[in-house]
Structures are given as C-alpha cells and as structure tokens.
Amino acid sequence: MDLLCSLTDGERQTGIERIYLDVKFLRRERESKTLTSGKFTPANALLILVDGENSGEVFRAPIDGYQGSTFKQLSINDNMNTDYMLQIINMHRQTLRENKVGSAIPHLNKKLFKAIEVPIPPYKEQQRIVKAINIAFKHLDTIMESL
C-alpha cells in the first residue's frame, strides 16, 4: 500500500473563508461551519479518518474546504484505479478499526495501513473487478430489500 497511496495534510491557508470538512459535516449530521484558516482540501479529494473509533473510513470532499483535524488526505497513485483502491481499503477497514494505536484517542495504525498488501492487476482488470463488486452489492441490496 505504501507505494500506491499516501496520507498527507493539505496546504495551510489563511484569510480565506471555507467550509470546515469535519466528520459530522461529511456524514450530514450537522450544518457546515466556516473557518478563515486551515489545511486546504479541494473538492473531490479523498479524506481518511485517522483519529477516533471509525479510523480507516474514507470520505470524498463535496466542495473545497479545510480538512478536519481527524483526517488525512488520501492520495492514490495515478496508475491505480481509485475505486479499486477504495475497495481494498474498505476490505481491511475492520482490521484497521480493531488495531488502532493510542490510549486516550485511538488513531489509525499507519504502519498497519502501509503494510496492507494490494494485488496489482492491469488497470482494465481493476476496472472489471470494481464493476463486478458493484454488481454484487446491487444484488445484495435487492435481496435485503426483499427480506
């Protein structure tokens, strides 16, 4: 995983009013708050939760804003299909949640995150895998609705 993606902070900005991209806003549990300084996150950037109980959960920034304090920006190598990588991360989410570090506030175990082994099929195969996963989830949704 270490060679395929990176966890970074956005560039620090001041004097520009932007939405604060915290977990409650991204989950639509709260209205937006604005700040005049913070770590810039462009719209559509991926944010991974690195602090708290749900470490490893990934969000897509809906608009330009300032990165929440419990996030890192997740950058995926251009040679990898983003949805494929997100499926790999999601597949390991429970392991990441169960192996957090820190006592007072649990944190994403970045060493474990970087050590995730990722099969690297050709790009077209990554796309095919994502399509197959999406179809399987649609079938599961249909089954769940019929229960």
Residues covered by each model-derived region:
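Non-catalytic DNA-recognition/assembly elements of restriction-modification systems
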Residues: 1-10, 17-26, 119-147
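Short, solvent-exposed loop/turn positions at domain surfaces
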Residues: 34-35, 102
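A short glycine-rich beta-alpha junction/loop motif
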Residues: 65-72, 102-123
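Interdomain signal-transducing alpha-helices
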Residues: 85, 93, 126-129
